[in-house]
Amino acid sequence: MRHFVTFVVGFLLSWGFLSSLQDPPSCRCRPWEPCWPDSHQWTSLNASIDGNLVHVQPVGSVCHDPHYDAVACGDVLDLSRNSGWRASNPATLQDWIWETGSGDNESCLLVSSSERPQEIPCHQGRLPLYSAAVKSTAHVQGVIRFAKDHNLRLVIKNTGHDATGRSAAPDSLQIHTYFLKDIHYDDNFLVHGDATGSGPAVTLGAGVVHSEVYKHGIDHKYSVVGGECPTVGIVGGFLQGGGVSSWSGFTRGLAVDNVLEYQVVTANAELVIANEHQNQDLFWALRGGGGGTFGVVTQATVRAFPDDPTVVSTLVLSSTRADTSFWVKAISRLLSILRSCNQQNVHGQLIITRPSVDILNAGLTLHFSNMTNVLHAETLLQPHIASLSEDQISTTLTSKFVANINSELRLDADIHPRGIGTLQTSMMISNELFGSSEGPLTVAQVFGKLPIGPNDLLFTSNLGGCIAANKGLDTAIHPAWRSSAHLVTYVRSVEPSIEAKKLALKEITNKYMPILYSMQPSFKVSYRNLGDPNEKNYQEVFWGEKVYKRLASIKAKLDPDGLFISKLGVGSEDWDTEGMCYQPQNRVSQPLRSLKYFLSVLKDT
């Protein structure tokens, strides 16, 4: 026994285990520490970026004492509902949930005095202390150098559309890329390092939002693979995380399948071009590895496609939630129609909402690409509608011809309900499940277990098609993207309180994700951009072991000091929740795993 104890102690010491416990974690500089930049240094940074540095104050401060202003508070309450205003403002994310911390003294909730007394103090929460509204690559380089020199927590905000609040962190310096707005269309784009030309493409500044590129596409008669939310930045986390398009993914692939080149400022403040001919590792990582992780992307060039005509048909049914059996049967039939249409190269999206307390709506929207005859599209759907009628499932069918898809997409900023926050999560449905005889019914039964409130949303995004056909492309997305039929996104509304936020986060992780994964327990795959904010196994769920291992290797090479850390991002496992303190897991977990192995061997002998 004495020899065994000697072995254990020697083993632990050989790994540096005991000494590592004595070493405090290395943390970013905080405002109360001597390392924090003084006012002269902040002034110098501001001058170096042409006066674009903002000292961030919560927008809700005008609704609280001692800064309460009834008129200003009313204005902000109205503006805060506008997603475009939130995208452009350094002191806002798209959702108050990620502006607040976890305690009552970590928030500045933007609510009217009738809902919450104005006497309650306002706090910074998770908002950055400073934000650099960069207007050039030189600005980005200067801010990165400043953050490195002063060991500051650095975050990147594009438009603030983020399911886990990656655009903010307490006591941080923010790079706000929203104002990088250049758009340039090229009939035959020449990738750096290749003189052959890559065909039509459009180069987009990091701050270009979907509505802006869609409007530009109308004028120049092209379209791109993009999302539906008009104020999401197309070059930021959307593109770098994968980029799902409900209206063009099936026919043109994911957004990352169609990116030709990135312009990036790296962790050493170097401006580089990343494509298939230079900085290939960085280019690969930025095609699915996630935003805010490998550098600051200042522009990207993506393929442009003809803005083709289409016929859009929508089947809508309504039911009371109390009629569970009817509801499950009806949703199952709509999913069966979607599956049948997919087999005929027609893609679509199922959206489930609750317009009132007693009524649930389900709408199946189908896209007949390159079709101009509405009657022909409806004729193709008639057998399905007749079958629904036989089962006493009443639906309403509407169809329209769309000359160009850009004009069909939302071009104005979304207006959100006042005070309501949202949390969202996602999972993928495999081809194996969806294509099985009981696939649509299994999916519908799981959907029936999820609560849908008046501000909640449950919807699918069509995968398959060109996304599956692109399986030979070497990108940094989870391999399961290529073998999945649909992405399911579940959005839950949250009342404006810290308690409601805490409860909603717990329910997403402990209640609703298990329900979704029960659909196919052996197939747990989620979309990083819309994943569970508390996902414990994010490396496997978002990327898969092989892809993540390669991403982690590239991250260590390009950003060894962890300047770019984002929640549930590559390399974040070695940092605390807010990316402030370095707490390397491997130094402890590896020797413990090895010790456990040796103990098991000893027991067996």
Swiss-Prot record:
Record domain FAD-binding PCMH-type: where: 122-307
Pfam assignment, any one: FAD_binding_4
Ranges in a coiled coil: none
GO BP annotations, alphabetical order: indole alkaloid biosynthetic process
Enzymatic class: oxidoreductase
Pathway as given in its UniProt record: Alkaloid biosynthesis; ergot alkaloid biosynthesis
Known role: FAD-linked oxidoreductase; part of the gene cluster that mediates the biosynthesis of fungal ergot alkaloid ergovaline, the predominant ergopeptine product in E.festucae var. lolii. DmaW catalyzes the first step of ergot alkaloid biosynthesis by condensing dimethylallyl diphosphate (DMAP) and tryptophan to form 4-dimethylallyl-L-tryptophan. The second step is catalyzed by the methyltransferase easF that methylates 4-dimethylallyl-L-tryptophan in the presence of S-adenosyl-L-methionine, resulting in the formation of 4-dimethylallyl-L-abrine.
Protein name as it appears in the record: FAD-linked oxidoreductase easE
Organism: Epichloe festucae var. lolii (Neotyphodium lolii)
Gene that encodes the chain: easE
